[in-house]
Swiss-Prot record:
Pfam families: DXP_synthase_N, Transket_pyr, Transketolase_C. NCBIfam families: dxs, PRK05444.2-2. Homodimer. Thiamine diphosphate binds at H89, G130, H131, S132, G162, A163, N190, F297, E380. Its EC number is 2.2.1.7. GO terms for cellular component: cytosol. Catalyzes the acyloin condensation reaction between C atoms 2 and 3 of pyruvate and glyceraldehyde 3-phosphate to yield 1-deoxy-D-xylulose-5-phosphate (DXP). This is 1-deoxy-D-xylulose-5-phosphate synthase. InterPro entries: Dxylulose-5-P_synthase (IPR005477), THDP-binding (IPR029061), Transketo_C/PFOR_II (IPR009014), Transketolase-like_Pyr-bd (IPR005475), Transketolase_BS (IPR020826), Transketolase_C (IPR033248). Belongs to the transketolase family. DXPS subfamily. Mg(2+) binds at D161, N190. It catalyses: D-glyceraldehyde 3-phosphate + pyruvate + H(+) = 1-deoxy-D-xylulose 5-phosphate + CO2.
C-alpha cells in the first residue's frame, strides 16, 4: 500500500494539484484509474491543508477521511446514492470533491460555505448536520424511502467512534436491523476506541466478509441447513467463532448487521474494493474503518485534539483556542476557575460534561478532582439524568454544557430535574450567536425553553464578575438553576476572588437617564451603555430572567415613556416576553420595544458581523430605539448620569 505523504507544515501558497483541478464532480472522479486515485488523494490532502490554513476551520477530522471520501464517491453513484456525514467536521474533502473547491477559502465566513453539510448548499449534501449521532437515523429513513419508491439507490451513513457513544445512534442501529433496509453504516474509528486489531489478517477477512461469493455461500448454506437445526446451530457458532478471532463485530452482528472490518481507512485500493463488494449486498451492512485524525500533517497526527480546528495562518498557524492566553479571560475560563474554587470548598460538588472538557474549560478540574469529574461522552440526556440521580443522594452536580446541546436533553431537564426540584446547576456556555459554526451551534433558544419551566432559576451575566457570582448563586440555590454565558471574552471587569453570591431576583441600575430605559439581559450590556451615553437613556442590568425584578420593572415603567428589552436570545418567548407578560398582569399598557434575535435561523459569520446583521450592535440598537421614539413622537433627551 502506498502510504500518504506526511506534510510537516501547512502550505502557505496554493499547491500544484493538476488532477484535483479537473474534478468538479464525483462523476469525473469515477473515470480515474487506481494510480490516479492515489494521486488525487495526495492532492486533496494538500489542498485541504492549504485551504483551511487560509480560512481557518475544522482540520483534523477531514485529513483523516481523505481516502475514505475518495473511495465513497468512486464506488457509489452520488448524489443518487445518499451519503450522510455525521456531525460534518469531516466533510471538507467531500465539499472539495463535489464542486466547491474554489469556494473553500470562504468556509465559515459570512456569505461563504457553511462549516457543515447543508442541503441548501449542494445536492451532494443529502442531510444537514452539525450535532452528532443523527446520520444513521437519517440514512435509514432514506433507505426506507428508496424501498417504498422501488428505487435502487443506496444509503450510507458515515459516523465517528465518538458519535457512536450517543444513544440515538444505537436506537437507529436497533431499528435498522428490524427493517432489513439496504443501509450501509461506516464507523470511522479514528481513536481506535473499539478495536486495535488492524493488520493483514483482518484486512483479508474484511475482504472475505464483504465479498459477494462469501455472502451467497452463507445464505445458500443457511437454506440447506434449515431442516437440520443442530447443524444450523453448529454452523452459526463456527462462523461466530471465526469472526470473533479477528473482528470486534459481535455487538453489531447481534443487532442484525453484517459486520465487516476493521480495515485500514487509509488503504485506498482496499477501501474501493471493499465498498464495491458491499454495494452488491442486501440488508444492513456495517463497515468498520480505522483512521488517524489529522492524517498526513505531522503536528495534527501528534496532537489531534489541539488541531481539531485551526485559525487562519497569519503567517504561521495557531492552534485554535490553545495559543497564548488572552489578556481578558474567556467566560469559559471564569467557569473553569470557579468550579475548581468551589470544589475545594465543597467536597460534594461533582462536575459533568457531555464530551466538552476542553471547550467548557474543565481540564484543570478533571486533573485536580478526577474522582468528581465525569465526561459522559456525547450523551446529553444521560448527563442531565445522571446529575439528577446524584442530586437525589446528596451530591451537588454541575452540568457544563453548550446551549445548543442542552436542547437535546429537554425532557430530562423537565421530567428528571425540574419536576423533582433537584439541586442541579447548569453552566450553559456558547449562549447567543457563536459565529462561524452557524445555526446548528447557535445558542438562540435557551432563555425561551428554560423560562417556561417551573422551579428554574435563570441568570445571564453581563461581565466576568457577575458570571462568577451567578455561578455561586445558582450552586447555593435550592432547586435547578441555570447560568447562560456567551462564547469568547468578557468586557474586562475586575473579578472578586471569593465565592460571593447575588440577591436572587435583584437587578442592578447601571445608568440613570430619562424617557427611555433599556432593560439588558446578559452580555450586550456594553453596547447598551454606549447607546445610553449618547442619548441619555437609563440602563438596568437585569441579571435575572427568572425571577424578574418586578419592583425594578414597575419603577422603570412608571418613570419612562419607552421600555426597551435587550437580549441575545430569540425574541419569541424570551426575557422581553417575560417583561411584557408581567406588565400585562399588572394592567400596565406602555410602549415596549423588544430587541433580540429575529424569528429566523442566523447563518454563519464572525460574531461582530452577525450582531450587526440582526441589529444587536450599538448602532443597530440606537437606530431601532430612534425609530420607535419617532413613531411615538418623542425626542431623545441629552443629559444623564451613571448610577
Amino acid at each position: 500500500m502506498q502510504k500518504p505523504y506526511v506534510f510537516q507544515e501547512i502550505p502557505v501558497h496554493r499547491p500544484n494539484t493538476p488532477l484535483l483541478d479537473k474534478i468538479d464532480s464525483p462523476a469525473q472522479l469515477r473515470l480515474l484509474n487506481e494510480a490516479e486515485l492515489l494521486q488525487l488523494a495526495h492532492e486533496l490532502r494538500a489542498f485541504l491543508l492549504y485551504s483551511v490554513g487560509q480560512s481557518g476551520g475544522h482540520f483534523g477530522a477531514g485529513l483523516g477521511v481523505v481516502e475514505l471520501t475518495v473511495a465513497l464517491h468512486y464506488a457509489f453513484n452520488t448524489p443518487e446514492d445518499r451519503l450522510v456525514w455525521d456531525v460534518g467536521h469531516q466533510a471538507y474533502p467531500h465539499k472539495i470533491l463535489t464542486g466547491r473547491r474554489e469556494q473553500m477559502l470562504t468556509i465559515r465566513q459570512k456569505d461563504g460555505l457553511a462549516a457543515f453539510p447543508r442541503r441548501e448548499e449542494s445536492p451532494y449534501d443529502t442531510f444537514g448536520v452539525g450535532h452528532s449521532s443523527t446520520s444513521i437515523s437519517a440514512a435509514l429513513g432514506m433507505a426506507i424511502a428508496a424501498r417504498l419508491q422501488n428505487q435502487p439507490r443506496k444509503a450510507i451513513a458515515v459516523i465517528g467512534d465518538g458519535a457512536m457513544t450517543a444513544g440515538m445512534a444505537f436506537e437507529a442501529l436497533n431499528h435498522a436491523a428490524d427493517t432489513k433496509a439496504d443501509l450501509l453504516v461506516i464507523l470511522n474509528d479514528n481513536d481506535m476506541s473499539i478495536s486495535r486489531n488492524v493488520g493483514g489478517l483482518s484486512n483479508y477477512f474484511a475482504r472475505l466478509l464483504a465479498s459477494k461469493t462469501y455472502n451467497q455461500m452463507r445464505d445458500s448454506g443457511k437454506r440447506v441447513l434449515q431442516g437440520a437445526p443442530s447443524l444450523m446451530e453448529l454452523a452459526r457458532k463456527t462462523e461466530e467463532h471465526f469472526k470473533g478471532m479477528v473482528a470486534p463485530g459481535t455487538l453489531f452482528e447481534e443487532l442484525g448487521f453484517n459486520y465487516i472490518g476493521p480495515i485500514d481507512g487509509h488503504d485506498l485500493p482496499r477501501l474501493v474494493e471493499t465498498l464495491n463488494n458491499i454495494k452488491e449486498l442486501n440488508g444492513p451492512q456495517f463497515l468498520h474503518v480505522v483512521t488517524k485524525k489529522g492524517k498526513g500533517f505531522a503536528h495534527a497526527e501528534s496532537d489531534p485534539i489541539g488541531y481539531h480546528a485551526i485559525n487562519k495562518i497569519e503567517p504561521k498557524p495557531k492552534v485554535q483556542d490553545t495559543a497564548k492566553a488572552p489578556k481578558k479571560p474567556r467566560y469559559s475560563n471564569i467557569f473553569g476557575q470557579w468550579l475548581c474554587d468551589m470544589a475545594e470548598q465543597d467536597a460534594s460538588l461533582v462536575g459533568i460534561t457531555p464530551a466538552m472538557c476542553e471547550g467548557s474549560d474543565l481540564i484543570e478540574f478533571s486533573k485536580r478532582f478526577p474522582e468528581r469529574y465525569y465526561d459522559v461522552a456525547i450523551a446529553e440526556q444521560h448527563a442531565v439524568t445522571l446529575a439528577a440521580g446524584l442530586a437525589c443522594d446528596g451530591a451537588k452536580p454541575v452540568v457544563a454544557i453548550y446551549s445548543t446541546f442542552l436542547q437535546r436533553a429537554y425532557d430530562q431537564l423537565i421530567h428528571d430535574v425540574a419536576i423533582q426540584n433537584l439541586d442541579v446547576l447548569f453552566a450553559i456556555d456558547r449562549a447567543g450567536l457563536v459565529g462561524e459554526d452557524g445555526p446548528t451551534h447557535a445558542g438562540s433558544f435557551d432563555l425561551t425553553f428554560l423560562r417556561c419551566i417551573p422551579n428554574m432559576l435563570i441568570m445571564a451575566p453581563s461581565d466576568e464578575d457577575e458570571t462568577r457570582k451567578m455561578l455561586t448563586t445558582g450552586y447555593q440555590y435550592t432547586g435547578p438553576a441555570a447560568v447562560r454565558y456567551p462564547r469568547g471574552n468578557g468586557p474586562g471587569a475586575d473579578i472578586s476572588p471569593g465565592l460571593e453570591s447575588l440577591e436572587i431576583g435583584k437587578a442592578n441600575l447601571r445608568r440613570r437617564g430619562a424617557q427611555t430605559v433599556i432593560l439588558n439581559f446578559g452580555a450586550l450590556l456594553p453596547a447598551a451603555l454606549g447607546v445610553a451615553e449618547e442619548s441619555n437613556f437609563t440602563v438596568v442590568d437585569m441579571r435575572f430572567i427568572k425571577p424578574l425584578d418586578q419592583n425594578m420593572i414597575l419603577e422603570m415603567a412608571g418613570s419612562h415613556d419607552l421600555l426597551v428589552t435587550l437580549e441575545e436570545n430569540c425574541i419569541l418567548g424570551g426575557a422581553g416576553s417575560g417583561v411584557i407578560e408581567f406588565l400585562a398582569s399588572q394592567g400596565i399598557a406602555m410602549p415596549v420595544l423588544q430587541l433580540g434575535l429575529p424569528d429566523e435561523f442566523i447563518e454563519h459569520g464572525k460574531p461582530a458581523e452577525l450582531h450587526k446583521e440582526v441589529g444587536l450592535d450599538a448602532q443597530g440598537i440606537a437606530n431601532a430605539i430612534k425609530k420607535r421614539l419617532k413613531s411615538l413622537n418623542l425626542a431623545s433627551p441629552k443629559t444623564g448620569t451613571s448610577a
